[in-house]
Amino acid sequence: MDEGLSEAVKEIFISLYEQDYIYKGTRMVNWDTQLKSAVSDLEVSSSTENGKLWSIKYKTELDDYIVIATTRPETLLGDTAVAVNPDDKRYSHLIGKKVEVPIVNRMVEVIADDYVDPEFGSGCVKITPAHDFNDYEIGLRHDLDFVRCIDFEGKIESKDFIPNNLHGLDRFKARKEIINQLDNENLIHSIDDHEIQIPRGDRSKTILEPMVSEQWFVKTKELAKKAIDVVENDEIKYIPKAWEKTYFEWMYNIQDWCISRQQWWGHRIPAWYDSEGNHYVGRDELEVRSKNNLSDKMELTQDEDVLDTWFSSALWPFSTLGWPNDKKDLQKYYPTSLLVTGFDIIFFWVARMIMMGIFTMNEIPFKDILIHGLVRDSQGRKMSKSLGNTLDPLELSKKHGADALRFSLIEKANPGQDVPFDEEWTVAAKKFGNKVWNAAKFVHLYTDELDSYELTEIKCSENHWIINRFNQTLEDFNSLMITYKISDAYKTLYNFLWADLFDWYFEFAKTLISNDSSKEETQKTIKHIFLKCLTMLNPAMPHLTEEIWSSFNKENLIDLSWPEFINTNHDEDNYVEHLKEIISSIRNFRLTYSIKNSTTISLFSVKIQEDWFTTQLSSLVNAQIEDINGLNNEESTTIFQSGKFKFEVVASEYFDKEKEVNRLENKIKQLQKSLDVSKSRLENENFMKNAKQELIDLERNNLDSFSEEISNLEIALNSLKR
């Protein structure tokens, strides 16, 4: 409804009208009696429901009767014919004869039409051209009268030919009255259970009423042809490709688009009427008068209807970029490369954007269309108010942050697959955001003294390692994004940031920065890589990354180029991986035997050439490196080894061996009991049959966790018993 977008809507409407794509006509439409507005075919949600099939007797002029089957007896008030199949010999003698419509006592003709299915019901159908889409077409073919018996509020018309007791009744209450009256007159032949397709409005959920109404329409056949061609020629691609079939099915069967709505809010139709009902289209009343040479004395009234929401939405790719006035952004960003959307609005929005983009710009609006699934609840059920499982994204954003919600959905959503959303994902994403925020503080703390952070020569193995890990992450990320595996791409970035950069490299960096010879190189490496990662993270966490970026730089992060690889020539990355493995083993050693971090551990080893290796080891696990020759060969040791690096520790120096053996044995017994309980539950048929899936999954996770912990403790126990 912004001024610029409103102007774009007017321009497109006028352009379509002047090129004979928009017209005003009387046609059958889906009418929402609650919204009191026409709705387009695509806003109709049809479902199969249990209903009734009434077979009703219609008297013939031959003093006999025929049986008519209908699911909507209330519409017989508007019947203007009875139809049979021309090949149905049972009724050939009645074609051209008259029958009497019950209750209204209207004499109508029996007509022959191929539409009638001889196998359905009695093979005779009532024709109500004013209240049924198929009957409407039959009415046009046979030049029948269109008699409206239901008004725009869904009530029976107060007309002379309709009995007074039905005037103003709701259509469904009238149905009951009509059935009772038919039954009293012995005109009900039979009533059978029958499955019916019920059309409801997408928004109101009200059963829609087919109504003949004067509305504005867009001719779509020619527009659709061009929109079909660009997809068939691979100018526009659907991902997954299977959605092209859905697109083509809709487009090849497209009908003229009803674009007028009888609502208060929306873009008002730029058309004016004179006292005789003639309409004039223009940007405003002054233009209408000038263009059509209308006198200032002639009274004009603007159309009170507004345009379908999807009409203005169809202009989104170019109207939001300044069209038709400011075209600077339009020239830069149109067409865009990718549209990400849900399958449920492929025709509502996607197809119409393609049609309007080609019509207006003579160019496709986007090149690729990535279709994601529906967001469901954690159990995979569709969200609905009746189930009480709906989640308000605004409330989630207020509670956890918009970036946390955005990242959690991006990380979990795969193309074409539904997302069983769990709020815990957003909680985890919020923690990740906090981790990034704290990482920014770390980077500021250690790098703010730098005048420049451009990398030159890299000497430290730890810095080479993190640069190579970044390059590999960037390569993997780019490859995944190119193929639109966006979820996998951000999982890759998440793992690099949390595990490699924050958990490992930042710890290495503290040691390096404490040494003057490696300080500046490490400071530059930290800042260089962290800021590149912010750029990669920006599409998934725009608010957080822009805020952090602004604390380092003046320009907007979103305007920057995508990160490039960092040049490095170093092949000692595996040494850092060996270092990580040994550090992890020693930390597990402390944890297993309850050795405090403040306790210095003596590690015995042969002379290691890589001083940086032992420096990091000493710093990160509070270890003192000793010469292996100082180790008593008779003492039992625990060995930590990875690649060529080997360290031994005399475990008994740090705890009472006998007490530790008893502690481990008792711990294993406790865990074994817990494991047996989980195993018993999972082997219980009643539990597996009746328990909720999340409880079953929890028990399976417990079983795996207990098994792994027991295995680790048994290894430690056997080591002590050697």
Q: At which residue positions do the language-model features occur?
A:
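Catalytic adenosine-cofactor/nucleotide-binding cores of aminoacyl-tRNA synthetases and other
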Residues: D202-S204, V375-Q379, M383-K459, N553, ...
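Core structural elements
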Residues: K431-H444, N463-Q472, K491-T511, S678, ...
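Acidic, turn-prone loop/beta-hairpin segments
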Residues: V29, T33, V39-S45, Y273, ...
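Glycine- and acidic
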Residues: E119-V125, K159-N164, E232-K245, T301, ...
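NTP-handling and nucleic-acid-processing catalytic cores
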Residues: M1-E153, K159, N180, I228-S260, ...
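Alpha-helical recognition segments enriched in aromatics with Gly/Pro capping
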Residues: H142-G154, Q262-G266, P270-Q417
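Conserved phosphate-binding loops in nucleotide/dinucleotide-binding enzymes
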Residues: S47, I127-A130, F172, E209, ...
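C-terminal low-complexity, glycine/proline- and small-hydrophobic-enriched intrinsically disordered tails
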Residues: V427, S550, E555-R722
